[in-house]
């Protein structure tokens, strides 16, 4: 399907915009699991400035301040305006916790489109999103093992950039995760917006990239099988930490 391929190819499309993501996924509060529970169970408000896959900035807006994530080819910098602290991380681990930027409609939409198989996608009626008459697509996974019932997305007809994504669990009537632009400017952000300039009172530190998979492999006596719950292992080497399925 042409629209599906257009969504997959939209990784280099620049944009600026305001996004709201609403999650209704109930997860237990796991210690040291980052902000995964809040991201998937609450409303996350973000401003996004994206020049491309290697240079972007996403500001998470909270009642007490902002948490701004700057991504450049060398790594990332997280600035917490409430704590007045900046942490730069060199590189990026193969396995990491979810972060607000993962909930942007283009990120969610492209991830789903990349995993879709032939015959799983069909067109939906258009929908107006952030001032754009967006074209719709429904992806319904065929695998009986998945808990995802369907994913509906609407994209910019010119660029294929996903503007709204709704994920509905199997057997559910309403989405458990929705992410959508409320405001969108289809242009490249100014270079200065993508560079972090620490304030004079900021505490600045640099951390190595946390490789969770490596730490699990280091201490676990177990190696996961090639097949788990009917899904093949995606990682090439058998390890204690692996990913499976699509």
Residue ranges, per PLM feature:
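Extracytoplasmic
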Residues: 12, 43-45, 53, 64, ...
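Accessory, solvent-exposed terminal regions and/or long lumenal/extracellular loops of proteins
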Residues: 42-43, 195-246
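N-terminal leader/targeting segments and the immediate start of mature chains
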Residues: 1-55, 88-91, 95-128, 209, ...
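Gly/Pro-enriched, hydrophobic low-complexity segments
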Residues: 59, 122-202
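One face of beta-strands
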Residues: 15-21, 46-48, 54-60, 67, ...
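Short, mixed charged/polar active-site loops
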Residues: 43-45, 66-68, 86, 148-150, ...
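Short, solvent-exposed coil/turn segments at beta-strand boundaries
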Residues: 50-56, 71-76, 82, 132, ...
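Long, acidic/polar, low-complexity amphipathic helices and coiled-coil-like
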Residues: 64-66, 73-156, 165
């Amino acid at each position: 399907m042409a629209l599906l391929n257009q969504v997959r190819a939209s990784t280099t499309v620049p944009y600026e915009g305001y996004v709201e993501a609403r999650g209704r996924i109930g997860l237990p509060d796991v210690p040291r699991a980052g902000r995964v529970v809040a991201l998937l169970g609450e409303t996350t408000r973000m401003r996004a400035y994206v020049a491309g896959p290697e240079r972007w900035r996403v500001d998470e807006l909270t009642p007490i301040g902002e948490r701004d994530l700057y991504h450049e080819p060398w790594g990332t910098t997280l600035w917490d305006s409430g704590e007045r602290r900046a942490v730069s991380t060199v590189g990026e681990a193969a396995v990491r916790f979810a972060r607000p930027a993962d909930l942007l409609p283009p990120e969610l939409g492209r991830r789903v489109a990349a995993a879709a198989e032939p015959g799983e996608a069909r067109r939906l009626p258009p929908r107006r999103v952030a001032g754009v008459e967006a074209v719709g697509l429904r992806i319904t996974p065929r695998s009986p093992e998945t808990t995802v019932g369907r994913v509906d997305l609407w994209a910019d007809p010119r660029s294929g950039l996903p503007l709204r994504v709704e994920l509905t669990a199997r057997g559910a009537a309403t989405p458990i995760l929705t992410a959508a632009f409320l405001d969108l400017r289809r242009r490249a952000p100014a270079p200065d917006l993508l560079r972090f300039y620490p304030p004079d009172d900021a505490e600045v530190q640099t951390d190595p990239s946390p490789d969770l998979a490596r730490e699990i492999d280091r201490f676990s006596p177990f190696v996961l099988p090639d097949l788990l719950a009917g899904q093949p292992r995606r990682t090439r080497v058998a390890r204690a930490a692996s990913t499976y399925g699509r």
